[in-house]
């Protein structure tokens, strides 16, 4: 009987469940979108129960459509939108408030207050993160401070906190297992990434009781089994967990120090494996845990670019210059260059390495000769320039030269963008045959834990190249173009809202 691994890819706008076979091939996919809640400007929330419902719905449809029985599933892996925080009552088994999403800015005042107390350096030193609403810790504090009766319940030990992976494992296991993995714990602002434990001092600053927190476990391990009522009585091992970007790093087989991947989604997230050493960034990067497996942990440097694929959506929906995302490539290749035009898509500020939340988008270099094609090309090029910003910071911090960049996500289908990316980095760009690297990474972690795959070497050998883009641009042109980008970013930062 052929066996499979089932991967839950719980994202920001939808949940997907994907079934993989031994060769890492996709045998079935099911996807469900869910509601985005915006209670106030800058706030983003999800209904955690609705997310759970989408998971169950995807389970049912993917098994039915792929004609796979529950007893053929060897294990379940989970990858998730990181930082999004859920607080639930362990007695009623229900969330006490909506999940506060990673994008939500509703805890800015809490962050400002902690900064005013001079605590930013301590948080940075222990967690590798910035004091920013992006991360989970201040979201948990906000819920305890703002939901009636929450703090009292928390002090009495009745409330549990988890990132989305924790919530799903708890529900899948019939409310038995309250766990998370190293990669997700490292995004909470409450976990000491050097000592590998929840940090009592940071919890005190955030006024979060330790009793709420999940047990932190390796990313590849059997955490428990599914409850009898989920898969017609079949108890399936829940065996792999990683935050979405770390799962993509694993799915891209970036197991060695210096290996890096860039995911081109709504934004771009670039991670470089730094091995068993946590590298402190002096250049605006985050230090994070990549994964824990085989009794040890790997660290990573991470750069966040806020606007990537969403810039292409903006060309389509906001500027109405294109009718579909693939059309951007056609227009970009109709001209030989951007004719001196630079688009800085700082629609929600600038991420790594600038961390300038006040910056706003700008366009430079327009002349009477500027055409729509130049504007579209310059927008695509901005994704590559921002990636260069991050890669340069990574090489400075790690003292490691990146030899190749592995890529995944929706925008990597754009051959023009991938070639320009290689040119502006002066590094080969590798696009894999299987683009679903996030879900695949979670599947690999689960499969290793249950013996479905034997080793990381076996997984590395299963990684297949679809296309490699080699740099073709001469150094003078490359550096001139990049210098223009740096000038444009500086000018953008001068013009504040």
UniProtKB/Swiss-Prot annotation:
Binding annotation for ATP: 12-14, 266, 309, 313, 410
Chain positions recorded as glycerol binding sites: 82-83, 134, 244-245
GO cellular component, one term: cytosol
Residues binding sn-glycerol 3-phosphate: 12, 82-83, 134, 244
Gene this protein is translated from: glpK
The protein's role, per its UniProt record: Key enzyme in the regulation of glycerol uptake and metabolism. Catalyzes the phosphorylation of glycerol to yield sn-glycerol 3-phosphate.
GO molecular-function terms, A-Z: ATP binding; glycerol kinase activity
Binding site for ADP: 12, 16, 266, 309, 410, 414
EC category name: transferase
Subunit structure: Homotetramer and homodimer (in equilibrium).
Protein name from the UniProt record: Glycerol kinase
Keyword set, alphabetical order: ATP-binding, Glycerol metabolism, Kinase, Nucleotide-binding, Phosphoprotein, Transferase
Pathway annotation: Polyol metabolism; glycerol degradation via glycerol kinase pathway; sn-glycerol 3-phosphate from glycerol: step 1/1
PANTHER family in the record: GLYCEROL KINASE, SUGAR KINASE
UniProt KW Phosphoprotein keyword: yes
Sequence positions bearing Phosphohistidine: 230
HAMAP family assigned to the protein according to its UniProt record, in alphabetical order: Glycerol_kin
Record PTM text: The phosphoenolpyruvate-dependent sugar phosphotransferase system (PTS), including enzyme I, and histidine-containing protein (HPr) are required for the phosphorylation, which leads to the activation of the enzyme.
Family: Belongs to the FGGY kinase family.
CDD domains, alphabetized: FGGY_EcGK_like
Reactions catalysed, as given in the entry: glycerol + ATP = sn-glycerol 3-phosphate + ADP + H(+)
Matching NCBIfam families: glycerol_kin (TIGR01311), PRK00047.1 (NF000756)
Lineage, highest ranks first: Bacteria, Bacillati, Bacillota, Bacilli, Bacillales
Record EC number: 2.7.1.30
A biological-process GO annotation: glycerol catabolic process
Record entry for activity regulation: Activated by phosphorylation and inhibited by fructose 1,6-bisphosphate (FBP).
């Amino acid at each position: 009987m052929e066996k499979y691994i089932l991967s839950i890819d719980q994202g920001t706008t939808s949940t997907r469940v994907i079934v993989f076979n031994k060769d890492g091939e996709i045998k079935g996919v099911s996807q469900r979108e869910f509601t985005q809640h915006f209670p106030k400007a800058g706030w983003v929330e999800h209904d955690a129960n609705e997310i759970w419902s989408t998971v169950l719905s995807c389970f049912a449809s993917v098994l039915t459509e792929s004609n796979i029985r529950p007893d053929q599933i060897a294990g379940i892996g989970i990858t998730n939108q990181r930082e999004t925080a859920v607080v639930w009552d362990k007695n009623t088994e229900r969330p006490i408030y909506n999940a506060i999403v990673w994008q939500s800015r509703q805890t800015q005042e809490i962050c400002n207050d902690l900064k005013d107390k001079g605590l930013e350096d301590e948080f940075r030193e222990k967690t590798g993160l910035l004091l920013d609403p992006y991360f989970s810790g201040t979201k948990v504090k906000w819920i305890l401070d703002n939901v009636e009766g929450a703090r009292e319940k928390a002090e009495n030990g009745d409330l549990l906190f988890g990132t989305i992976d924790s919530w799903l494992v708890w529900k899948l296991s019939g409310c038995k297992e309250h766990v998370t993995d190293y990669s997700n714990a490292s995004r909470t602002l409450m976990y000491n990434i050097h000592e590998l434990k929840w940090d009592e001092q940071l919890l005190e600053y955030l006024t979060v009781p330790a009793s709420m927190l999940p047990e932190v476990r390796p990313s590849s391990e059997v955490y428990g089994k599914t409850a009898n009522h989920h898969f017609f009585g079949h108890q399936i091992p829940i065996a792999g967990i990683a935050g979405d970007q770390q799962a993509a790093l694993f799915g891209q087989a970036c197991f060695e120090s210096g290996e890096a991947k860039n995911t081109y989604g709504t934004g771009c997230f670039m991670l470089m494996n730094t091995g068993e050493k946590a590298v402190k960034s002096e250049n605006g990067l985050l230090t994070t845990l990549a994964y824990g497996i085989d009794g040890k942990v790997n660290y990573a440097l991470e750069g966040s670019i806020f606007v990537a694929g969403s810039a292409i959506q903006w060309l389509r929906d906001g500027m109405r210059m294109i009718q579909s995302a693939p059309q951007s490539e056609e227009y970009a290749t109709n001209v030989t260059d951007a004719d001196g035009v630079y688009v800085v898509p700082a629609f929600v500020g600038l991420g790594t390495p600038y961390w300038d939340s006040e910056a706003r988008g700008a366009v430079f270099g327009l002349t009477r000769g500027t055409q729509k094609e130049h504007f579209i090309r310059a927008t695509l090029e901005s994704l590559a320039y921002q990636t260069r910003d991050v890669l340069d910071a990574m090489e400075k911090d790690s003292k490691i030269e990146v030899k190749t960049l592995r890529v995944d996500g929706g925008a990597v289908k754009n051959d023009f963008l991938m070639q320009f990316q290689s040119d502006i980095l002066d590094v080969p760009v590798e696009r894999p045959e299987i683009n679903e690297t996030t879900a695949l990474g979670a599947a690999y972690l689960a499969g290793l834990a249950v013996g479905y795959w034997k080793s990381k070497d076996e997984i590395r050998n299963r990684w297949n190249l679809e296309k490699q883009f080699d740099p073709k641009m001469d150094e003078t042109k490359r550096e001139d173009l990049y210098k223009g980008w740096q000038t444009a970013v500086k000018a953008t930062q001068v013009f504040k809202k």
